[in-house]
A protein has these predicted regions:
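Fe-S-dependent hydro-lyases/dehydratases of central metabolism
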Residues: 1-220
Length: 220
C-alpha cells in the first residue's frame, strides 16, 4: 500500500481505499527540507549545561531506599510459600498496571506477588521493621516482638551472634522461580521490602538467579 492509498484510506474514515478510486488530481510539489521542524522538538544540552538549575522530578519519580550490606549472621523469615511447579517473573512482579511505577521502587514493590500471594508485602514489611530498628540503634525485639523470642534461641546456639553482626529479613520459598522475562524488578522489589534470600528447589533461569545476587540476595 503506497502513501497515496494510505492517505485515501484515512480520508475515507479508515475504509481501505485505493488512491485511484479517489477523485483528485495528484500533484508533485517540490519538497524543501526544513531542519527547524526537528530542531524545535529535540533538546540538545551539549555545551549549555547549567548546574545552578535544579532538575524537577515528577511526583512518581523516587530515589532508591537505603539498603544495608549483608551481615555476617541473618535471621530470615519465610513470608511466602509458592508450591506451583514454576513461578514466573510476571507473578513475582506483574507487568501492565505496574508500568507507571518503574521509577518508584517502593511504589512498585507494593505490587510484588500481588496475583499469587496478596499478603506477601505486609508480611515482608513486618519483619523488615526489625532490621530498620537495628539500623537506627533501637531494639529489634521491641519493634517486632517475635524477634525477642527468636533471639533467645539464636544466642544459645550461636553465642557470637549479636545485634552488631546480625540482620533480620524476609525470604520466599518457590519450587522453581524466575521463569519468563528478564525483568530485574522481580528481585529488586523483594530487596526493597527487606528480602535477603530466595529458597528454591531450582531456579528457572540463570538470569533470575543472577538478579538475586546482583541485588544482594542469597539464592539458596
Amino acid at each position: 500500500m503506497d502513501a497515496r492509498s494510505i492517505a485515501a484510506t484515512a480520508a475515507n474514515k479508515g475504509f481501505l481505499t485505493a488512491a485511484t478510486d479517489v477523485d483528485v488530481n495528484f500533484s508533485k510539489p517540490k519538497y524543501f527540507f526544513d531542519k527547524n521542524i526537528y530542531a524545535n522538538r529535540v533538546f540538545d544540552s551539549k555545551g549549555v549545561a547549567d548546574p545552578s538549575v535544579e532538575i524537577q522530578f515528577g511526583p512518581n519519580i523516587k530515589d532508591w531506599p537505603a539498603m544495608s550490606a549483608l551481615p555476617e549472621n541473618m535471621v530470615l523469615k519465610v513470608v511466602s510459600e509458592i508450591h506451583d511447579p514454576v513461578t514466573t517473573t510476571d507473578e513475582l512482579i506483574p507487568s501492565g498496571e505496574t508500568s507507571s511505577f518503574r521509577s518508584n521502587p517502593l511504589g512498585l514493590a507494593e505490587f510484588a506477588l500481588s496475583r499469587k500471594d496478596p499478603e506477601y508485602v505486609g508480611r515482608a514489611k513486618e519483619i523488615q521493621k526489625a532490621q530498620k530498628a537495628i539500623e537506627s540503634g533501637e531494639c529489634a525485639g521491641k519493634a517486632v516482638p517475635e524477634v525477642a523470642e527468636i533471639m533467645g534461641v539464636v544466642k544459645k546456639k550461636f553465642p557470637e551472634a549479636s545485634h552488631e553482626n546480625m540482620g533480620f529479613g524476609s525470604t520466599i520459598f518457590a519450587v522453581k522461580p524466575g521463569d519468563g522475562s528478564a525483568r530485574e524488578q522481580a528481585a529488586s522489589c523483594q530487596k526493597v521490602l527487606g528480602g535477603w534470600a530466595n529458597i528454591a528447589n531450582e531456579y528457572a533461569t540463570k538470569r533470575y538467579r543472577s538478579n538475586l545476587i546482583n541485588w544482594g540476595m542469597l539464592p539458596f
